[in-house]
Each structure stands twice: as C-alpha cells, then as structure tokens.
From Swiss-Prot:
InterPro entries: PhaG_MnhG_YufB. Pfam families: PhaG_MnhG_YufB. GO terms for molecular function: sodium:proton antiporter activity. This is Putative antiporter subunit mnhG2. The lineage of its organism: Bacteria, Bacillati, Bacillota, Bacilli, Bacillales. The chain crosses the membrane at residues 11-31, 51-71, 72-92. Keywords: Antiport, Cell membrane, Ion transport, Membrane, Transmembrane, Transmembrane helix, Transport. It comes from the Bacteria. NCBIfam families: CPA3_mnhG_phaG, PRK12586.1. One of its GO terms (cellular component) is plasma membrane. It is a multi-pass membrane protein. The keyword Cell membrane applies.
Amino acid sequence: MEIIKDIVSLIASILIFLGSIIALISAIGIVKFQDVFLRSHASTKSSTLSVLLTVVGVLIYFIVNSGFFSVRLLLSLVFINLTSPVGMHLISRAAYRNGAYMYRKDDASRQSTILLSQKEFNTPEELKKRAKLREERREKLYYKEKEYINKMDD
C-alpha cells in the first residue's frame, strides 16, 4: 500500500513540475512575442494548461497523502479554466478594435524593435484611423451578410 501511495505522489509531483515548466514557457512567450495578440495567445493557452496540471497535481497529492478532498481546489480549477480564455478574448477584441499593432511576417526582417513596425507609425491618430477603417469594413460585411440572409428568407 505504501508503494502505491509513493507512485501516486510521484505522479502528482510530475504533474506539478510539468505545470511549472509550462508556466515558464508561457512567461518566455509573453516576453518574446511581438504583439498583443501573440502575447495573449501565449499567456492564455499555456497558463490555463499550467494551472490545470498544477491544481490537479496538488489535488491528487492531498487526496493520497492526507485523505483530504478540496472542493476549493476543484472550484478554482473550473473558475480559472472558464474565465481565463473569455477574459483574454475580450482583451484581444478591445485591442483589435482600438487598432493595436499586428505583427506581420514581412516585418520580421525589417523590424527594429519589438513594438513598432518600420512600415507604419503607431501614433494614437494612426491607431484610431486603422480602427475606424476596420469598423467600416466590418459594417459593410455585416450589411452584406444581412442582405444575403434576408434574400434567402424571401
């Protein structure tokens, strides 16, 4: 019985360690990626997985060694896995609508800093101009789609 307890504790430790490694990779991605959208992708996907692995490892460890099942850990796991992607989606959507800089592959050879592209200026006026242009395009597509749906209904 003691051997099984040790094996399950080892599995829990491995899960916690993997969660820590994935959190480290997430932190590196946040620092290395070029724009808001890539950074949000790195932070959301991998941090959600790292929290999942870490909390499951802790839950298993406490169940085996203490015989203690924590509803708080389970609720925190559910809460984080539901709210983290939704929150980051809202942040990314707000950044997109405000005209935040988007990294492009052709910027890679000419890019001098992480935040700015040499092709375009990221002054507040330019950002507002791009956001307005995106909104106009979105409205045109929305109305075309609405007309198409109305035509199909008739």
